[in-house]
């Protein structure tokens, strides 16, 4: 079977590296990270990938420049070998730069093609759709369609530990990517704007080598023809790879005491509370030792918010810039003035999206 992982723009290479580190051969094609194998490799990827958004089973690809062509493409796939006759079929679609741009119409045609194929197999007109779910995803770009099954259900960023809201949260998969890009694996880590704790917790999961999907379920576990044994084995494998780390190895701080308590609560849910030391302090009082500092400082779209954020960047310059001889620093922000306000040019800069906000990841290494 062929699968592919999706990732945020420009992070496909990071996702491919993660798969290779899991012992899975991967290649990047058309902004997707493809790999092949049996159910155990799908389970390993779902459980172990940190920066990917979703993982799919690739069903079929082909030309879809008309509704007839799309129907024939869908109908040609072996759906009766993939979807049970009681399976719930959900269709999602994305269309761009194509003749077929109506998402509802595309969804309708794809569902029609699948049902027609199942009708021919099972010789029945009505399907109850009251059993396991099959989430079919259709992407049409430049009149070419990719049809796949979403293996995850909830996106891979849903680790299960973050349940309390915080202002401008960083998605877990993005936080994991920031840590991977700067080369953090295990060692002292600092986050002076911890918010709800995402960067610190993702750092602790990585330091412990705890697979991020170890304690959640995936939609594909219930697919027809899939057994639970592969998932049991891969979860056992992941648990065996967990390592011990020094208590308080990671320091997470914030000027807002309520955010510090929220981060502590999330760390407890993630099972990494002992790895993180939480402090209530402003960034201007930061004083860390050797290690890595990765942070998502406040930023805003309104003038007042921007001015406040820029004052914070100057505080960072006072407290963090003198420590760069012993700290590797990574800062994600959409503000193109960051380097000037911080008072030093970055050694590397990478474009990254935080949700739909285009940011730069400034690295001082």
Question: Where are the regions a protein language model picked out?
Answer:
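Non-catalytic nucleic-acid substrate-recognition regions in nucleic-acid-modifying enzymes
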Residues: 1-132
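Short SAM/SAH-binding signature in class I
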Residues: 290-296
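C-terminal edge-of-domain segments
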Residues: 136-152, 362
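Conserved S-adenosyl-L-methionine
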Residues: 170-287, 302, 306-308
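A short, flexible beta-alpha/helix-coil linker loop
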Residues: 96-99, 155, 298-302
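Conserved Class I SAM-dependent methyltransferase catalytic core
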Residues: 2, 6, 10, 247-249, ...
